[in-house]
Amino acid sequence: MIVEIPKNSANKYEYDGKLGVFRLDRPLYSPLHYPGDYGFVPGTLADDGDPLDVLTLMSEPSFTGCLIEVRPLGFLELVDSSERDQKILAVPKSSPRYSEIATVDQVWPHMRREIEHFFTIYKELEGKETRIEGWRGPIDARKLILDCRQAYLDAKAETE
């Protein structure tokens, strides 16, 4: 994954592919912070037209632009302003702290609720609604990543 927003940030950064830089999209309207490093899987295209989103559990934040090799545990399915959206939940492959966590079901229940809560309310003050649909496991996450990779390759082939 490529980190756009480090853990504990209250700013939403996005990668601008046309300019090749990370830019500030907006500060969060709510007094919240991202519960993990947040970014995207390069070379993917999700249903929302952007690369597939990833939230990586971290003890300490990394930095914007950091490449982290991750292991997907599953994903959170949600509806964001009437659009389907998925957030892969992952852990760094190199971290011994998460070596025994293989699926989203093994993530501490309170941490899962914190993540759900964040994605439920982080856009409320912007007047946007987000609804949680549930968690899916690592097999579904790998399939989602492969499907989004294929969508990216198909879109790229159409423009060449």
Which residues are covered by each model-predicted region?
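Hydrophobic N-terminal alpha-helices or hydrophobic patches in metabolic proteins across all domains
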Residues: M1-E160
